[in-house]
Protein backbone atom coordinates (compact mmCIF):
# COMPACT_ATOMS: atom_id res chain seq x y z
CA UNK A 1 0.00 0.00 0.00
CA UNK A 2 1.48 3.31 -1.09
CA UNK A 3 -0.02 5.25 1.83
CA UNK A 4 -0.94 4.14 5.31
CA UNK A 5 -4.45 3.38 6.46
CA UNK A 6 -4.19 6.33 8.87
CA UNK A 7 -3.21 8.72 6.06
CA UNK A 8 -6.09 7.54 3.90
CA UNK A 9 -8.59 7.81 6.75
CA UNK A 10 -7.38 11.27 7.75
CA UNK A 11 -7.62 12.40 4.13
CA UNK A 12 -11.32 11.54 4.27
CA UNK A 13 -11.79 13.41 7.53
CA UNK A 14 -9.98 16.43 6.08
CA UNK A 15 -11.84 16.58 2.77
CA UNK A 16 -15.20 14.79 2.82
CA UNK A 17 -17.81 16.91 4.56
CA UNK A 18 -20.95 18.81 3.59
CA UNK A 19 -20.75 22.33 2.16
CA UNK A 20 -21.01 25.13 4.65
CA UNK A 21 -19.31 23.39 7.54
CA UNK A 22 -15.92 22.08 8.53
CA UNK A 23 -14.65 18.51 8.73
CA UNK A 24 -16.43 15.86 10.75
CA UNK A 25 -15.08 15.17 14.21
CA UNK A 26 -14.26 11.69 15.42
CA UNK A 27 -17.16 12.00 17.88
CA UNK A 28 -19.56 12.71 15.01
CA UNK A 29 -18.36 9.67 13.11
CA UNK A 30 -18.71 7.44 16.17
CA UNK A 31 -22.24 8.76 16.81
CA UNK A 32 -23.26 8.21 13.18
CA UNK A 33 -21.89 4.67 13.23
CA UNK A 34 -23.72 4.00 16.50
CA UNK A 35 -26.97 5.19 14.88
CA UNK A 36 -26.36 2.52 12.22
CA UNK A 37 -25.87 -0.13 14.91
CA UNK A 38 -22.08 -0.18 14.63
CA UNK A 39 -20.01 0.16 17.78
CA UNK A 40 -16.62 1.83 17.59
CA UNK A 41 -14.87 3.32 20.58
CA UNK A 42 -13.31 6.76 20.56
CA UNK A 43 -9.90 5.36 21.55
CA UNK A 44 -9.99 2.81 18.71
CA UNK A 45 -10.86 5.44 16.09
CA UNK A 46 -8.13 7.68 17.52
CA UNK A 47 -5.62 4.82 17.23
CA UNK A 48 -6.66 4.21 13.62
CA UNK A 49 -6.22 7.90 12.82
CA UNK A 50 -2.85 8.15 14.58
CA UNK A 51 -1.49 4.98 13.02
CA UNK A 52 -1.15 3.16 16.34
CA UNK A 53 -3.63 0.57 15.04
CA UNK A 54 -2.94 -0.40 11.45
CA UNK A 55 -4.97 -3.49 10.62
CA UNK A 56 -8.71 -2.76 10.93
CA UNK A 57 -11.21 -5.45 10.08
CA UNK A 58 -13.09 -5.48 6.82
CA UNK A 59 -16.22 -4.55 8.76
CA UNK A 60 -14.49 -1.51 10.25
CA UNK A 61 -13.25 -0.38 6.84
CA UNK A 62 -16.73 -0.90 5.37
CA UNK A 63 -18.37 1.11 8.17
CA UNK A 64 -15.97 4.03 7.76
CA UNK A 65 -16.26 3.92 3.97
CA UNK A 66 -20.05 3.93 4.26
CA UNK A 67 -19.94 6.98 6.52
CA UNK A 68 -17.86 8.89 3.97
CA UNK A 69 -19.96 7.53 1.08
CA UNK A 70 -17.09 5.80 -0.69
CA UNK A 71 -16.13 2.21 -1.49
CA UNK A 72 -14.17 0.31 1.15
CA UNK A 73 -11.64 -0.45 -1.60
CA UNK A 74 -10.29 3.06 -0.95
CA UNK A 75 -8.42 1.62 2.02
CA UNK A 76 -6.95 -1.44 0.29
CA UNK A 77 -6.80 -0.88 -3.47
CA UNK A 78 -4.03 1.52 -4.51
CA UNK A 79 -5.50 2.09 -7.97
CA UNK A 80 -8.93 3.00 -6.58
CA UNK A 81 -7.29 5.14 -3.88
CA UNK A 82 -5.28 7.09 -6.48
CA UNK A 83 -8.38 7.67 -8.59
CA UNK A 84 -10.47 8.88 -5.66
CA UNK A 85 -7.61 10.92 -4.21
CA UNK A 86 -7.47 12.94 -7.44
CA UNK A 87 -11.17 13.73 -6.98
CA UNK A 88 -10.56 14.68 -3.35
CA UNK A 89 -7.75 17.02 -4.43
CA UNK A 90 -10.11 18.63 -6.95
CA UNK A 91 -12.70 19.04 -4.19
CA UNK A 92 -10.13 20.77 -1.96
CA UNK A 93 -9.13 23.06 -4.82
CA UNK A 94 -12.73 24.00 -5.60
CA UNK A 95 -13.40 24.92 -1.97
CA UNK A 96 -11.10 27.91 -2.48
CA UNK A 97 -13.35 30.92 -3.18
CA UNK A 98 -10.85 32.54 -5.53
CA UNK A 99 -10.46 29.39 -7.61
CA UNK A 100 -14.22 28.97 -7.74
CA UNK A 101 -14.69 32.56 -8.93
CA UNK A 102 -12.13 32.06 -11.70
CA UNK A 103 -13.81 28.83 -12.81
CA UNK A 104 -17.26 30.42 -12.78
CA UNK A 105 -16.08 33.37 -14.85
CA UNK A 106 -14.31 31.10 -17.36
CA UNK A 107 -17.38 28.89 -17.75
CA UNK A 108 -19.14 29.63 -21.02
CA UNK A 109 -16.16 31.27 -22.69
CA UNK A 110 -15.13 29.83 -26.05
CA UNK A 111 -12.30 27.27 -25.93
CA UNK A 112 -9.80 29.75 -27.36
CA UNK A 113 -10.62 32.28 -24.64
CA UNK A 114 -10.36 29.61 -21.94
CA UNK A 115 -6.92 28.71 -23.29
CA UNK A 116 -5.88 32.37 -23.00
CA UNK A 117 -7.01 32.35 -19.36
CA UNK A 118 -4.98 29.18 -18.74
CA UNK A 119 -1.93 30.65 -20.46
CA UNK A 120 -2.16 33.78 -18.31
CA UNK A 121 -2.52 31.70 -15.14
CA UNK A 122 0.59 29.73 -16.15
CA UNK A 123 2.47 33.03 -16.61
CA UNK A 124 1.38 34.22 -13.17
CA UNK A 125 2.36 30.91 -11.56
CA UNK A 126 5.83 31.13 -13.12
CA UNK A 127 6.18 34.75 -11.98
CA UNK A 128 5.24 33.67 -8.44
CA UNK A 129 7.67 30.74 -8.53
CA UNK A 130 4.87 28.16 -8.44
CA UNK A 131 5.08 25.11 -10.69
CA UNK A 132 2.72 25.61 -13.62
From Swiss-Prot:
InterPro entries: Cro/C1-type_HTH, Lambda_DNA-bd_dom_sf. It comes from the Bacteria. Changing residue 69 to A: Affects protein stability. Decreases affinity for DNA and dimerization capacity. Changing residue 122 to A: Moderate impact on protein stability. Does not affect DNA binding. The keyword Ribosomal protein does not apply. Induction: Negatively autoregulated. Transcriptionally regulated by the MprB/MprA and PhoP/PhoR two-component systems. Expression is growth phase-dependent, peaking in the stationary phase. Probably induced upon phagocytosis. Virulence regulator that has both architectural and regulatory roles. Impacts cell wall functions and pathogenesis through regulation of multiple genes, including the espACD operon, which is a key ESX-1 component. Influences target gene expression positively or negatively, depending on its binding position relative to the genes it controls. Acts by binding directly to the DNA. May play a central role in regulating virulence gene expression. This is Nucleoid-associated protein EspR. Homodimer. Binds DNA as a dimer of dimers. It is found in: Cytoplasm, Nucleoid. Disruption phenotype: Mutants exhibit growth defect during infection of mice. They establish a stable infection by three weeks, but the bacterial burden is an order of magnitude less than the wild-type. It comes from Mycobacterium tuberculosis (strain ATCC 25618 / H37Rv). One of its GO terms (biological process) is positive regulation of DNA-templated transcription. Changing residue 100 to A: Affects protein stability. Decreases affinity for DNA. Does not affect dimerization. Residues 38-50 bind DNA. Keywords: Activator, Cytoplasm, DNA-binding, Repressor, Transcription, Transcription regulation, Virulence. The keyword Transcription applies. GO terms for molecular function: DNA binding; identical protein binding. Gene3D superfamilies: 6.10.250.2310, lambda repressor-like DNA-binding domains. GO terms for cellular component: cytosol; extracellular region; nucleoid; peptidoglycan-based cell wall; plasma membrane. The N-terminal domain binds DNA and the C-terminal domain is involved in dimerization. Both domains are required for transcriptional activity and for ESX-1 function.
Amino acid sequence: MSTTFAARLNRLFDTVYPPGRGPHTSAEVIAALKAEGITMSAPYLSQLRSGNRTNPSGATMAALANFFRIKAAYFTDDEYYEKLDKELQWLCTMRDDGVRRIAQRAHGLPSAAQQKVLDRIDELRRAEGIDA
